[in-house]
Amino acid sequence: AIAYRLNTAEGVLITDGDKGCSYCLSENEGKLPSFSVPVVETTGAGDSFVAGFVHQLSKLGIHSLADAKIAKQVVTYATATGALTTTKPGAIAAQPTAAEVEAFLEGRGEELGTTV
């Protein structure tokens, strides 16, 4: 549906806070739930999501998004990055490190059915 409406876009990411994230990357579409975390402040969560997404793209390359499994992993990483940002006060100070995101996801690997 997203690809049909925006057929000139390489991809679309739609975040909706605690309702999760929808994505269309290459020919891969999906919806991921949000992570259940104790929320302190939501400022910067969207920026953090984008930072996590771009971080994964810089490691894997944009062409990797053509693989459905990798596309889901990249969006999962971005979702985790945004979620972790909400667990601390402040927009900048709350930004997690790559190691913090990876540790967070490792603890949820079975729950997600994926690894990053």
Regions found by a protein language model. Name each.
Residues 1-116:
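Conserved phosphate-binding/catalytic region of the ribokinase-like
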